[in-house]
């Protein structure tokens, strides 16, 4: 597979045009990706793309889709919604048949009108936002469960083990605010409310005010609705104050240990894809492990597993779409996936639903960075 991957947006766009020009007469299937390759979630984005690349490479080695090779063009948006919109327009103009694996709720909300105006599918993204699911948003096809599903699982677990004094620090953007709403609703169902609520500015690690506000409330648990870097900064600062609590984070922060190391131990992380390390009873996990083991970076991870599943869904849809391939035909095919099993991971779509999966599993970070279930 040819992968065009640029860490600077200006350079990326220039490279994209050159790449597209060279591909103009070919029958290659062009897929477009925009993500944070240089900002606070760069490591997670890169790992996600690694999973997509691994699967696309494997398909191309086997002859591609009806003899056509898949080409992924990946552009850096630095987690900036305006840059995501710019990249999206460029990818559409250069004949991408679908957009895959985007990151960020604000980023996704920014591109919805662009995607719908172009009649192109956006397949798989890392946002669990309700606003991208309910009411139904045409042209989006989610792979992961929603943030609401993740938070409900976390709160339910807390209640089960006798924790009901919960505080929340949230990323001050659409993602964080929707997560806060989901947490508030989950606690209201149980006749409670958060004991403290504190925002963290988007795209920063400015956590001191949030740490002070939450530590003063002495919660039993703190749910962090943010990316890995600010979450790591929060936990480090919170522990430095001598305060203690059970920390709980969402799947977008599964790279927490890489940022925080041993102090991340004991943190509960909700996961939205199957356990990628030893769950050999799951067919798609076995396939993932076999393919990833044949790549230069043989490391198994949740982020690359999610990217892998996204790529597998894309290829399944491409294979089932009748030739000649068009954006509209691909969307129509995806809408027929009312119960599409990727090998132990099922996805559900229709003309009025883009939910995909509701799979959530809770894990705990060990001191060495591995996950216990």
Question: PLM features: what roles do these ranges have?
Answer:
Residues 91-103, 123-125, 167-170, 218-227, ...:
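Periplasmic-binding protein-like
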Residues 235-307, 371-372:
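Extracellular/periplasmic periplasmic-binding protein-like sensory domains
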Residues 30, 43-50, 63-131, 201-204, ...:
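Beta-alpha junction/loop-to-helix N-cap segments that form part of ligand/metal-binding clefts
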Residues 22-26:
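N-terminal signal peptide c-region/cleavage motif recognized by signal peptidases
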Residues 294-304, 315-371:
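Segments of small-molecule ligand-sensing domains
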Residues 32-52, 75-82, 103-106, 169-177, ...:
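Extracytoplasmic "Venus flytrap"
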Residues 41-66, 182-188:
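Short, polar/charged alpha-helical segment
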Residues 86, 129-131, 138-242, 276-286:
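Extracellular/periplasmic Venus flytrap/periplasmic-binding protein
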């Amino acid at each position: 597979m040819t992968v065009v991957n640029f860490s600077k947006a200006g350079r990326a766009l220039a490279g994209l045009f050159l790449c597209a020009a060279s591909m103009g007469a070919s029958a290659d299937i062009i897929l477009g990706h925009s993500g944070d390759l240089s900002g606070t979630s760069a490591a997670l984005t890169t790992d996600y793309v690694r999973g997509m690349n691994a699967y696309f490479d494997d398909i191309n080695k086997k002859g591609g889709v009806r003899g056509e090779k898949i080409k992924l063009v990946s552009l850096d948006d630095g987690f900036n919604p305006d840059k995501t919109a710019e990249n999206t327009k460029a990818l559409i103009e250069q004949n991408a048949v679908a957009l895959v694996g985007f990151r960020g709720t604000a980023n996704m909300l920014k591109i919805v009108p662009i995607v719908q105006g172009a009649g192109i599918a956006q397949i798989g993204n890392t946002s669990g936002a309700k606003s991208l699911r309910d009411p139904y948003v045409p042209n989006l096809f989610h792979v992961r469960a929603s943030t609401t599903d993740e938070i409900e699982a976390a709160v339910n677990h807390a209640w089960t083990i006798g924790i009901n004094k919960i505080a929340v620090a949230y990323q001050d953007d659409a993602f964080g605010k929707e997560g806060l709403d989901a947490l508030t609703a989950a606690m209201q169902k149980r006749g409670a409310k958060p004991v403290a609520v504190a925002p963290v500015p988007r795209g920063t690690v400015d956590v001191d005010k949030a740490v002070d506000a939450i530590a003063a409330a002495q919660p039993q648990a703190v749910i962090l609705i943010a990316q890995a870097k600010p979450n790591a900064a929060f936990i480090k600062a919170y522990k430095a104050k001598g305060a203690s609590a059970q920390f709980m984070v969402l799947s977008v922060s599964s790279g927490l240990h890489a940022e925080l190391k041993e102090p991340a131990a004991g943190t509960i992380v909700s996961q939205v894809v199957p356990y990628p390390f030893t769950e050999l009873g799951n067919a798609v996990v076995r396939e993932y492990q076999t393919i990833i083991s044949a790549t230069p970076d043989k490391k198994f991870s949740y982020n690359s597993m999610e990217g892998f599943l996204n790529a597998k869904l894309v290829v399944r849809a491409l294979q089932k779409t009748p030739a000649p391939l068009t954006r509209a035909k691909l969307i129509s095919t995806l809408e027929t996936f009312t119960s599409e099993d990727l090998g132990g991971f099922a996805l559900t779509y229709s003309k009025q639903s883009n939910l995909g999966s509701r799979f959530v599993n809770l894990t705990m970070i060990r001191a060495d960075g591995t996950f216990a279930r």
